[in-house]
From Swiss-Prot:
InterPro entries, alphabetized: FeS_biogenesis, FeS_cluster_insertion, FeS_cluster_insertion_CS, FSCA_dom_sf, HesB-like_dom_sf, NIF_FeS_clus_asmbl_NifU_C
Family as reported in the entry's similarity comment: Belongs to the NifU family.
Organism: Frankia alni
A GO molecular function held by the record: 2 iron, 2 sulfur cluster binding
Region listing for Disordered, in residue ranges: 126-150
Role of this protein: May be involved in the formation or repair of [Fe-S] clusters present in iron-sulfur proteins.
PROSITE patterns in alphabetical order: HESB (PS01152)
Full protein name: Nitrogen fixation protein NifU
Keywords: Nitrogen fixation
Pfam families: Fe-S_biosyn, NifU
The encoding gene: nifU
Listed GO biological process terms: iron-sulfur cluster assembly; nitrogen fixation
Compositional bias per record (Low complexity), positions renumbered to this chain: 135-150
Length: 192
């Protein structure tokens, strides 16, 4: 809240500004978070009074954001708002995109491939890639439950995204580890 108050105080004409929190379809996991300073509430907004300012959320996003916590974090390499959303059934390394069981396409994929297991394995792999400045984001896309029939789509970002060794990283590290742990995975593919 302190960072929002600071932003409001340093914005010319800040009186009456509110923090709008919302979601848009898209991103690497299904939805992306939106934050904006806005002059007022609109028709269909829910207004949530905070300590010194109001948060507004349009009613269409309330169910996806209910119970979410927004924090501001600073590290040696970055700073920004972070989201802890109990409605997020999946998320990506960027921290600004999430998947929800309300997304029918994502729900179908999750039902066919154990996304939680894929994500747990990816969490073991990510520190190795982060050491090189890269971050993989996974998205199960299944075509069946039998051994070797499911697919996992990966987006390599950061240094890995532009690296000429991305395919070697994919097959030598990520695909080998995923297929070892989850025999239903037949293919791991890079996506743009």
């Amino acid at each position: 809240m302190a960072q929002v108050r600071h932003l409001l105080g340093s914005t010319p004409g800040h009186r009456g500004l509110r923090l709008r929190i919302g979601v848009d379809p898209g991103g690497c996991s299904g939805y992306t978070y939106k934050l904006a300073l806005v002059p007022g509430a609109e028709t269909g907004d829910v207004v949530l009074p905070q300590d010194g300012f109001d948060v507004v959320v349009h009613t269409t996003g309330v169910d996806l954001l209910r119970g979410m916590r927004v924090d501001y974090t600073e590290t040696l390499t970055s700073s920004g708002f972070t989201f802890a959303n109990p409605n997020a059934k999946s998320s990506c390394g960027c921290g600004s995109s999430f998947g929800s069981s309300d997304d029918p396409e994502r729900t179908a994929a999750d039902a066919k491939l154990p996304r939680t297991q894929v994500e747990e394995i990816m969490e073991e792999i990510r520190p190795m890639l982060r050491g090189d400045g890269g971050t993989p984001r996974s998205s199960p896309s299944s075509r069946g439950r039998s051994a070797g029939s499911a697919e996992v789509h990966l987006r390599l970002t950061g240094a890995c995204g532009g690296c000429s060794s991305a395919n070697a990283t994919l097959t030598g590290v990520i695909e080998a580890r995923l297929r070892q742990q989850l025999p239903e995975i037949g293919r791991v593919a890079l996506v743009a």
